[in-house]
Amino acid sequence: SSTSRGLGDVYKRQALLHDVGKTKELSSFPLNDYTDEGQLLGHIIIGAQMIHDLAKEIPDFPEMLENQLVHCILAHHGELEYGSPKKPALAEAVALNLADNTDARMETLTEIFAADKGKKEWLGYNRLFESNLRRTGDV
């Protein structure tokens, strides 16, 4: 059915849309600073509002699909203490949180390795990863 097909597409849509609020949270180049809206609301709330507003402009947009997309945006940081107003309650939201967290951790790891480029393979203990980190290959 079109409903089940629409729900299956939530994975793709939320992967593309989860940080859409950053387009209004941050000012454009060269400033790259937080806007007033960004400071007051943050990209999660801004993004949820954007999706809600866009869904209302599309005739017969399924309310359940809108709610699922908005939920994925609201829950993509995973925990209340990390800025999510909601914890993931859908499989799609859990998957998005795991992917977003993995992406952020890998970016952090890349930055750690780049900063310690002159060091040998073992970089020592890292509090964020709670582990002794070792460089492998060209990373």
Regions found by a protein language model. Name each.
Residues K12, E25-D36, K56-K117:
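Histidine/acidic-rich helix-loop-helix segments that form or flank divalent-metal centers
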Residues N97, A115, K119-R127, T136-V139:
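N-terminal intrinsically disordered, cationic/polar leader segments
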